Amino acid sequence: MDGYQAPSDQEVKVERIIHRACERVVILNTLDFLYGHVLLKLYNAQHYIDKHPDLGLVIVLPRMFQWLVPQGVAEVWLVDQRLGEAHGWYAAIDRFVQQQLPNYKEVYVGRGYAHPEFADIDIERFTGVRPFPMEEFLQRPPHVTFVARQDRLWFATPAAKFLYRVLNKFGLKKSLGRWYVHAQDRLIRRSMDRISARLPGVRFTVVGLGDKGGFGTDVDDLRTQRMDKATELAWCAAYAQSQVVVGVHGSNMLLPTAHAAGCIEVLPYDRYGNIVQDVSVRYSDRMQLFLYRFVDEFASPSTIARHTISMFKDFAVYHRDNRENIF
């Protein structure tokens, strides 16, 4: 409401892309200042495409998400605006919308629920990448992908996290914070070593915004400082080849969990109230309890490895008891 009461006169370009002309439409507004919120709202598109075929779906979307527009959409209104600027009310966007409304005979406003039922969502319709098929969990070579964020790190101890926050408070994160990024890399490397010792032939991938290096030639390091569609698709392909993805809680886990068979998430204490909100849960039965695991924010590499190994070693019996031997 604050933004509405104090609208911005900043010019914002909006591009209208018409895939299918419709006289009756429902408009799904996905604009938000947080990446995860936009993606979660976009997931609702499948509902309107499938449940309301008599209405053309119009999606209002930040341009950086254009690669995720699913087939079946009538129109896309691409907004050239940084996510961080999507707090307020922009007269330019409102003006564009008002200009388009007379083009239709009927217009409905779609509800963009923040947490739709993930198990019903077909992520391939959004990314074009087929997710890991559970029935091939043990047939495919073991593959684990680590999601390594540099803005939300995995810390070894409470003291390490406290000192990192001190650096941030005094403006030293850019100069001295690299040590903590390298410390996270060491935690990931130690996790890989422990997993490899029990799962011969396991393959590893690392993704995330960051600089490559430090893991050796046996790890497929897909980290980069610049994002584009090719990188997004390469990351999704890595998730879809993975039985397990590992990462710290955050919106960075939405697409990995939508494509991989399962995950291990490092959950900070101050995010307990948001548990599972960043996980695209693919299953509606007990398999979700087995395949989606949450560990302490200061979990050791041994803990990560122990859960990963269990997911492979115990999968056959758990799947048989909870998926096969039931009515």
Residue locations for each model-derived region?
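Short, glycine/acidic-rich beta->alpha junctions
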Residues: 37-41, 187, 227-231, 245-250
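A donor-sugar binding/catalytic signature common to diverse glycosyltransferases
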Residues: 235-278
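Short loop/turn segments at strand-loop or loop-helix junctions that form parts
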Residues: 23-29, 141-171, 207-209
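Secretory-pathway glycan-assembly enzymes, especially type II membrane glycosyltransferases
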Residues: 1-143
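Short, charged/polar "capping" segments at the starts of alpha-helices
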Residues: 63-70, 211-217, 271-277
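Catalytic donor nucleotide-activated moiety binding site of glycosyltransferases and closely related
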Residues: 62-63, 148-152, 169-232
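A short, glycine/small-residue-rich beta-strand->loop->alpha-helix junction that serves as a flexible
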Residues: 30-41, 152-157, 181-183
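Leloir-type glycosyltransferase catalytic cores
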Residues: 110-132, 275-327
